[in-house]
């Protein structure tokens, strides 16, 4: 019962709607009141204005002096300076060339940053250092001094005086050798300069001599104990052995550094 009433009312509403709009859409389309589909075509003047650029530059207003000169008649033959400059200006100047960054941006390339990145600012430019000396090389200035020390024997190269040269019968020190006194100060300076490089060589002659004296300490002490100079040398070797002595390696005493023996202890 209820459904039939709802259906009848719906049909009645549809009939009333059809009667109210009967023929009106056709009349509105013919009269131009109905909005037509599609984009509207602008008139010719609007198209010409759009092609000329937007906004279109209008006429510039001349200054007041030029306006007064044009309105005042008769006026003097020679116009004032402002009017002459205005007449000589002509069309507006062309636009200036854009900067390089703007041109690169327009071409699709990112501009190069003028400031270098932080890592390049921290590090200084690479410097060319002098080549380091190899272990088997020695400075050119100390070559002559090194040859002289090697020619004097093991005791002269190590800097420890021999027992026979310094110990006499009366126990006094013997005078220095004449070839030592003949050395110049320059040779001594070059010898002192070249000594650190020789000390770094574990296979050098001086290192082997020092190692032999430390191993045979008792023998050196017995030989040099006869005189005052010899006793001083023995005491020096004894103190050096005490300073450099360690727990030992294969029954041998180690030197101060522990690398000249070559035993790897």
Curated annotation (Swiss-Prot):
Main location: secreted
A Pfam family this chain is assigned to: ANP
Region (Disordered): 153-211
Keywords: Cleavage on pair of basic residues, Cytoplasm, Disulfide bond, G-protein coupled acetylcholine receptor impairing toxin, G-protein coupled receptor impairing toxin, Hypotensive agent, Metalloenzyme inhibitor, Metalloprotease inhibitor, Protease inhibitor, Pyrrolidone carboxylic acid, Repeat, Secreted, Signal, Toxin, Vasoactive, Vasodilator
Disulfide cysteine pairs (residue numbers): 249-265
Tissue: Expressed by the venom gland.
Domain of life: Eukaryota
An example molecular function term from Gene Ontology annotations: hormone activity
Organism expressing this protein natively: Bothrops insularis (Golden lancehead)
Biased composition (Low complexity): 184-194
Effect of residue 76 to A: Low decrease in ability to enhance AsS activity
Biased composition (Basic and acidic residues): 196-206
Keyword Signal found: yes
N-terminal signal peptide: 1-23
GO BP term (any one): regulation of blood pressure
Record's protein name: Bradykinin-potentiating and C-type natriuretic peptides
Impact upon substituting residue 78 to A: Low decrease in ability to enhance AsS activity
């Amino acid at each position: 019962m209820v459904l039939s009433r709802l259906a009848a009312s719906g049909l009645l509403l549809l009939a009333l709607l059809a009667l109210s709009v009967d023929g009106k859409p056709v009349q509105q389309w013919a009269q131009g009141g109905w909005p037509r589909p599609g984009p509207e075509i602008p008139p010719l003047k609007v198209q010409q204005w759009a092609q000329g650029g937007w906004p279109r530059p209008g006429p510039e207003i001349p200054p007041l002096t030029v306006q007064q000169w044009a309105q005042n008649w008769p006026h003097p033959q020679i116009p004032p300076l402002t009017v002459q400059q205005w007449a000589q200006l002509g069309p507006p100047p062309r636009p200036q060339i854009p900067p390089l960054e703007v041109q690169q941006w327009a071409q699709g390339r990112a501009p190069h940053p003028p400031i270098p990145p932080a890592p390049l600012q921290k590090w200084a430019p690479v410097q060319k250092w002098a080549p380091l000396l190899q272990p088997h090389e020695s400075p050119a200035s100390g070559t002559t001094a090194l040859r002289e020390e090697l020619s004097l024997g093991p005791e002269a190269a190590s800097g420890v005086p021999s027992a026979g040269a310094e110990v006499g019968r009366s126990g006094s020190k013997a005078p220095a050798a004449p070839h030592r006194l003949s050395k110049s100060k320059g040779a001594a300076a070059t010898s002192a300069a070249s000594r650190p490089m020789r000390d770094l060589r574990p296979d050098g002659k001086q290192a082997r001599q020092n190692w032999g004296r430390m191993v045979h300490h008792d023998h050196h002490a017995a030989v040099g104990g006869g005189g005052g100079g010899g006793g001083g040398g023995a005491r020096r070797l004894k103190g050096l052995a005490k300073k450099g002595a360690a727990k030992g390696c294969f029954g041998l005493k180690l030197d101060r550094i522990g690398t000249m023996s070559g035993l790897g202890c």
